[in-house]
């Protein structure tokens, strides 16, 4: 694999992690508003 492939894999991984973190924070905010 060349550097571009490695970079792409890293970007894809961090993108998925970021999406998960955003989903979790949104869910937590929704839970707070429900109380």
UniProtKB/Swiss-Prot annotation:
| Miscellaneous comment text of the record | On the 2D-gel the determined pI of this protein (spot N148) is: 5.6, its MW is: 37 kDa.
**Regulation of this protein's activity per its record:** Light regulated via thioredoxin by reversible oxidation/reduction of sulfhydryl/disulfide groups.
- Which biological pathway? Carbohydrate biosynthesis; Calvin cycle
**This protein's record includes keyword Chaperone:** no
Main localisation, per the record?
A: plastid
The GO biological-process annotations, alphabetized, read as: reductive pentose-phosphate cycle
* EC numbers on record: 2.7.1.19
Q: Which domain of life is it from?
A: Eukaryota
One example GO MF annotation: phosphoribulokinase activity
Please report which protein family the annotation says this sequence is part of: Belongs to the phosphoribulokinase family.
- The entry's protein name is Phosphoribulokinase
